[in-house]
């Protein structure tokens, strides 16, 4: 009798993706983040579903409904903080996943990489709209500032912003539609993640050496299932510690003040995972220029495969490129720090320098360095 996992139409898809999938024998823990992102997404959808059962998307009751969840619903505080900090874990895993792709040249799988960029944009949009829902001060003003950026688009800008707002300011209509979008987007993200995997399994996984690994494959189960479970346990431990010991560490205290359109907070800033892009936005004095730089700070990932001038795929054997990669990481951490600082000297100048460094490194210095390394190979 044939094994059911190999003949059943549905089960055999799962089998070929998670059990009998041929995987390179040398992939490191940096390849764990795909499965961790899947776990994050499932956690976010489940906790979000339970929150949506008690949340009301009305300006008068949104804030108090979140309070009600935390105070009166059984383990409501746990669900709410798992959801809020789960988003932070999601972005930590996302950034590490993208960083891994950059370091080991995984961006050479073009379809997988481009779907990944789409996923990143979709997750960022979801997180932004989710931050608006508790209707605290930072929710309201964050929504006002970020949506207002669209008014920089020539000719249609103002109409577009008012169309998104559903009025002349961020109000009930805005909150209701953001809740609707925030509810539907994670399912679109899940569908895109399926397509992401579909394209990945067309080519097979990359590996740290960047070489073709067809001659040396091992089955995904049990080798990488057990490895992924270990990664998941570590992530769950970190998330649980964060939720149970310091759930508000990554949040903004201003969001515990109900939204007040008449009172602007001294420093409007988004969640920590958007600060690097926010710093790039603020470092350009022109509104339209800032918006373009903001979009390009993520969209630049799409041109990275075109800028791959090296003869080797991975950075594993390219020490000069490795140095530049870690300078880029340090630069992004600097931008994240600057994004959370007030707009005053010396932070403005540091932000501008870090922004220029970010784009110059990716567009100019790294491709040129790769070409130099190609010449060094001949020695």
Curated annotation (Swiss-Prot):
The keyword Transmembrane applies. A ubiquinone binds at residue 201. PROSITE patterns: CYTB_CTER (PS51003), CYTB_NTER (PS51002). Its cofactor is heme b. Keywords: Electron transport, Heme, Iron, Membrane, Metal-binding, Mitochondrion, Mitochondrion inner membrane, Respiratory chain, Transmembrane, Transmembrane helix, Transport, Ubiquinone. The chain crosses the membrane at residues 33-53, 77-98, 113-133, 178-198, 226-246, 288-308, 320-340, 347-367. GO terms for molecular function: metal ion binding; ubiquinol-cytochrome-c reductase activity. Heme b b562 binds at residues 83, 182. It is a multi-pass membrane protein. Heme b b566 binds at residues 97, 196. GO terms for biological process: mitochondrial electron transport, ubiquinol to cytochrome c. InterPro entries: Cyt_b/b6_C, Cyt_b/b6_C_sf, Cyt_b/b6_N, Cytb/b6-like_sf, Cytochrome_b, Cytochrome_b_C_euk/bac, Cytochrome_b_N_euk/bac, Di-haem_cyt_TM. The cytochrome bc1 complex contains 11 subunits: 3 respiratory subunits (MT-CYB, CYC1 and UQCRFS1), 2 core proteins (UQCRC1 and UQCRC2) and 6 low-molecular weight proteins (UQCRH/QCR6, UQCRB/QCR7, UQCRQ/QCR8, UQCR10/QCR9, UQCR11/QCR10 and a cleavage product of UQCRFS1). This cytochrome bc1 complex then forms a dimer. Heme 1 (or BL or b562) is low-potential and absorbs at about 562 nm, and heme 2 (or BH or b566) is high-potential and absorbs at about 566 nm. Belongs to the cytochrome b family. This is Cytochrome b. The gene is MT-CYB.
């Amino acid at each position: 009798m044939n094994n059911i996992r190999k003949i059943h139409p549905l089960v055999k898809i799962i089998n070929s993706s998670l059990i009998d999938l041929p995987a390179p024998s040398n992939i490191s823990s940096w390849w764990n983040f795909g499965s961790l992102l899947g776990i994050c997404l499932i956690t976010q959808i489940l906790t979000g579903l339970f929150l949506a059962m008690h949340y009301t998307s009305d300006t008068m009751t949104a804030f108090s409904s979140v309070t009600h969840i935390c105070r009166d619903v059984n383990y409501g505080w746990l669900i709410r903080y798992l959801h809020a900090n789960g988003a932070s874990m999601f972005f930590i895993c996302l950034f590490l996943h993208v960083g891994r792709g950059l370091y080991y040249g995984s961006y050479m799988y073009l379809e997988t990489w481009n779907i990944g960029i789409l996923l990143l944009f979709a997750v960022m949009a979801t997180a932004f709209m989710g931050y608006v829902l508790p209707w605290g001060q930072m929710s309201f003003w964050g929504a006002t500032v970020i949506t207002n950026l669209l008014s920089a688009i020539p000719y249609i800008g103002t109409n577009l912003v008012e169309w998104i707002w559903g009025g002349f300011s961020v109000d009930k209509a805005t909150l209701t539609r953001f809740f609707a979008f925030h509810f539907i987007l994670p399912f679109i993200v899940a569908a895109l993640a399926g397509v992401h995997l579909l394209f990945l399994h067309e080519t097979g996984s990359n590996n740290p050496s960047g070489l073709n690994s067809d001659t040396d494959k091992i089955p995904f189960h049990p080798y990488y299932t057990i490895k992924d479970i270990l990664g998941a346990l570590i992530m769950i431990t970190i998330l649980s510690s964060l939720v149970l010991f310091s759930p508000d560490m990554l949040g903004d205290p201003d969001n515990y003040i109900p939204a007040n359109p008449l009172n602007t907070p001294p420093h409007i800033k988004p969640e920590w995972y958007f600060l690097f892009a926010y710093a790039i936005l603020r470092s350009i004095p022109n509104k339209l220029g800032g918006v373009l730089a903001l979009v390009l700070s993520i969209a630049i990932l799409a041109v990275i495969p075109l800028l791959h001038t090296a003869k080797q795929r991975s950075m594993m054997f390219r020490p000069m490129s490795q140095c530049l990669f870690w300078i880029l990481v340090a630069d992004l951490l600097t931008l994240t720090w600057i994004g959370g600082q007030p707009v005053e000297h010396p932070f403005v100048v540091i932000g501008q320098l870090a922004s220029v460094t970010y784009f110059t490194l990716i567009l100019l210095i790294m491709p040129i360095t790769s070409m130099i390394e190609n010449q060094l190979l001949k020695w």
